[in-house]
Amino acid sequence: MSKTLFIADFFANQILGGGELNDAVLLERLRQTLSVVDALPSHEVRLSDCEAYDNFIVSNFVNLSKKVKDHLQSKNYVIYEHDHKYLVGRNPGVYPNFEPPASDIINRQFYVKARAVFCQSNFHAAIVKANLGLDNVVSLGGNLWPEEHFEVMEEMCKYSRGSTTYAVIQSPVLHKNTSEAVQYCEALQLEYGLVLPQEPVSFLRDLGTYTTLVFLPKTPETLSRVVVEARMMGMATKTTSNIGAIHEEWFTKKGLDLIDYMRRRQEEIIEMVLLIIFEKGEE
């Protein structure tokens, strides 16, 4: 019986970040499909774990030890990339044309030896390919949501919003650039409100009461879950070219059309992961 280990720095019961929320859906679906799927925080993974499992899905791995990373390179694993952990600072946006010097690239062999490096969008994948010269990069072109969240977004599509209002995400993370989004709204005398950090369903219900999302990140967003959520709720978006989602063909969709598309894409993403790491899934 094949055994699979899912590795991540944090899980959704610890941090409600976009990567963790995506991983929670992926992990749940893998457990519905495969016989044995366990999960461990990256800092707890030991060399003995590398021998105890047959397959590995590595999400965020900042806290994974060098010994374990080196050992995994002889194993069957994929990297489910949420940012750019081959860079010292994980941010290609600090370099001209997103091109770092060779001295700032780390973990290269860990990416080279993976069966696949799954990226969130074509934009994300192009940056990774350009910087690492890999031929194992796969663009997923989407994200994963639980059905409950899709249902809430469907509900918010029907919400009567009235006058034009602008949403700004209140984030303590500097590169999310809340301050510039506020300045943009105030300079144009737009009616805006701050959407505060909160649990996902409440966040969606709050965000969905506005007509437009203003999101102006300073760094490349591999996809931007919140921008896609806004589009799925029928909202307009004011963003920058740093958003991975806006470069996808499906970004012209919005509302129920985009929700239906993302539901289908979610199934395709999960199937893609299974096909690549398990070939035809667990036999």
Predicted regions: what they are:
Residues 1-64, 238-283:
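N-terminal pre-catalytic "stem/leader" segment of glycosyltransferase-like enzymes
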Residues 96-117, 126, 208:
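Membrane-proximal helix-turn-helix segments that form the acceptor-binding/catalytic region
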Residues 31, 49-55, 65-78, 90-92, ...:
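Glycosyltransferases and closely related glycan-assembly transferases
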Residues 215-227, 232, 242, 246-248:
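Nucleotide-sugar-dependent
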Residues 144-206:
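Conserved catalytic-core segment of nucleotide-activated headgroup transferases in glycan assembly
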Residues 112-137, 177:
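A short, active-site helix/loop in glycosyltransferases that binds the activated sugar's phosphate group
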Residues 208-210, 229-236, 240:
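Conserved donor-binding/catalytic loop of nucleotide-activated donor transferases
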Residues 55-58, 72-101, 118:
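Active-site proximal beta-strand in glycosyltransferases
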